[in-house]
């Protein structure tokens, strides 16, 4: 597989074209950002940890019948993925109240949400990824009703699979975001799943083991990511 020019440079990943029109290479960098890119730092080992963590999770989801864009690891920091036509909507599933939900509704952090909630946000850094609803998605043509229904079904299936995985590792899956795209017309899970895009707390102590350690200045960010990976059995 020949790696060609950079197509896109995000806050923490770079996307490269290949000699296969249906495949891309994702490069996980050490860049760590918060507050829509207003704060950026370099954290040693982060790119490699997130690349391998993502590969582990995506393979678990594939095994559970959820189609993902992940194909294979290429190096410590690179993986081969399917080229998707991305839908500009983030799907967020919440099992416990945290983050923007707490700020938006004024509820106490850590309250269990039964059933889990499903939320939609427009992917737009300039606007701060605003909260939207299903009517917006349909009215602006970001996805069809059928595509949105499939995204919602997959989101809850991901929650079901990963809740057990993390629970067995002594962790609470507080919330997470997913992005989807189309591969030859079919809805496929894209982007990544790592501690950058979910909240994970230790089940006993409620210690934060995710990117909130960076956002809130708690320190030991990569050490927490590596501890989560170790508990799950991710080969680093």
Swiss-Prot record:
It comes from the Bacteria. Pathway: Purine metabolism; IMP biosynthesis via de novo pathway; 5-amino-1-(5-phospho-D-ribosyl)imidazole-4-carboxamide from 5-amino-1-(5-phospho-D-ribosyl)imidazole-4-carboxylate: step 1/2. The keyword Nucleotide-binding applies. Keywords: ATP-binding, Ligase, Nucleotide-binding, Purine biosynthesis. Gene3D superfamilies: ATP-grasp fold, B domain, Phosphorylase Kinase, domain 1. It catalyses: 5-amino-1-(5-phospho-D-ribosyl)imidazole-4-carboxylate + L-aspartate + ATP = (2S)-2-[5-amino-1-(5-phospho-beta-D-ribosyl)imidazole-4-carboxamido]succinate + ADP + phosphate + 2 H(+). GO terms for biological process: 'de novo' IMP biosynthetic process; cobalamin biosynthetic process. InterPro entries: SAICAR_synt/ADE2_N, SAICAR_synt_PurC, SAICAR_synth, SAICAR_synthetase, SAICAR_synthetase_CS. GO terms for molecular function: ATP binding; phosphoribosylaminoimidazolesuccinocarboxamide synthase activity. The keyword Ligase applies. Its EC number is 6.3.2.6. GO terms for cellular component: cytosol. It holds the Pfam family SAICAR_synt. Belongs to the SAICAR synthetase family. It comes from Pseudomonas aeruginosa (strain ATCC 15692 / DSM 22644 / CIP 104116 / JCM 14847 / LMG 12228 / 1C / PRS 101 / PAO1). This is Phosphoribosylaminoimidazole-succinocarboxamide synthase.
């Amino acid at each position: 597989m020949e790696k060609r020019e950079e197509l896109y440079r995000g806050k923490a990943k770079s996307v490269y074209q290949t000699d296969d029109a249906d495949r891309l290479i994702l490069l996980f960098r050490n860049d760590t950002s918060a507050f829509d890119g207003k704060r950026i730092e370099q954290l040693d080992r982060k790119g490699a940890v997130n690349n391998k963590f993502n590969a582990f999770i995506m393979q678990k989801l594939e095994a559970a019948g959820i189609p993902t864009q992940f194909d294979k690891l290429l190096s410590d920091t690179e993986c081969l993925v399917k080229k998707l036509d991305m839908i500009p909507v983030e799907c967020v599933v919440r099992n416990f109240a945290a983050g923007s939900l707490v700020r938006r509704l004024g509820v106490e952090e850590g309250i269990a949400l039964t059933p889990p909630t499903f939320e939609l946000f427009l992917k737009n850094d300039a606007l701060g990824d605003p909260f939207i609803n299903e009517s917006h998605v349909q009215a602006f043509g970001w996805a069809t009703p059928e595509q949105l229904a499939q995204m919602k079904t997959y989101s809850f299936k991901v929650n079901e699979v990963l809740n057990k995985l993390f629970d067995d590792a002594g962790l609470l899956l507080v919330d997470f975001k997913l992005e989807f795209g189309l591969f030859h017309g079919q809805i496929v899970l894209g982007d990544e799943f790592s501690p950058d895009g979910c909240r994970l707390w230790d089940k006993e102590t409620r210690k934060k083991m995710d990117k909130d350690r960076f956002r809130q200045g708690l320190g030991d960010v990569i050490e927490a990511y590596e501890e989560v990976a170790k508990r799950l059995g991710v080969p680093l």
